[in-house]
Amino acid sequence: MNQPIFVADCRYIEALREAFGRFGTFVPSAPCKTLAEPESCHPDMALYADAESTVICAPPVYEAYRRLLSPFGVTLVQGKITPGRDYPENVAYNVLNAGGFAFAKWAGAEPQIVDFLEKRGIVRHHVAQGYARCSALAFADSVITADPSIARAAADSGLSVLQIEPGHICLPGYDYGFIGGASGLLDARTVGFFGDLRLHPNGDAIRSFITARGFSVCDVPHRPLTDVGTILMVKSSFSV
């Protein structure tokens, strides 16, 4: 069976491959130079992926990702919005898929993503948090987030929610990163964290919330949880 394809921050690609390479192929991200440097290599700032082999990509990195991902059978769609350096111009592609819904701050969202979702009948919910994808880990019908607006919208949609403390996640160049940016689905029943969950004050609660839903956890011992712009699956070998 074909393994999943992931895009991961090029600055951490070797560490990510060492930690999670057994789960699939890890492709280094293409830096998007219109974004601020700390997030310029974050996949979730320039890509929207449905994990079923369609990726909507920001114009500045479209050709680079076409070369990187086309050999794996990934379909690339060029977006219309070039992400800016500052918030909220930088979050056009930052859309969270969770439990069959899509969550984002839709004003300023990439129109190709909106069109993609509407054609598939996926219900969109507005949240105040522009970094929707970064701010939440979604798996099955469950969401883990520190953001109140995402937690509220997800709960109102019937999803199971664990709300955690903000912070406690490294993102060099900023005060802190987000739980979604430090994690991702690795296979049909495994959630990965780039760092050690034991170092997070809610680590035990996070692990229990995940395992109670029949998923296992794969983290990186002794490493601080680090926001790498999501362990972004762009093509899966299973139904998501």
Placement of each model-derived feature along the sequence:
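Histidine/cysteine-enriched polar flanking segments
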Residues: 1-240
